[in-house]
Amino acid sequence: MLALALALTASSALADEVGDAHKLASQGRDSYSNCLAGEYSRPEAKGMSVQDFAADIAIACPSEWQNFRVRLLDYLSLQFPSTDTGVHLTTVNHAIATAEKDVMTAFLRRKGATN
């Protein structure tokens, strides 16, 4: 009976840890996306070429980028511990690329609307 109670407690603690990691990863994503949106909203961005804006986005928000990267990797490692870290890194890189693609898409739409 004691072993069952300990197993349930450990399982509950792991579920809480995974839930907390998911929340932190989501907050990291939101922070990074909001920072990129801030770059899009800067008055100077309206006059940038597509290439210049893409270069700006690639180096923008380094602390938010790093936080999102670390938090998402932590979450994936907890949620899927048997999955190879390389797979998790690919997922993280895809999530970051998607956030950057979203702001680039908005920029391109705005550029198209002003031409």
Question: Whereabouts are the PLM-identified features?
Answer:
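N-terminal signal peptide c-region/cleavage motif recognized by signal peptidases
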Residues: 4-13
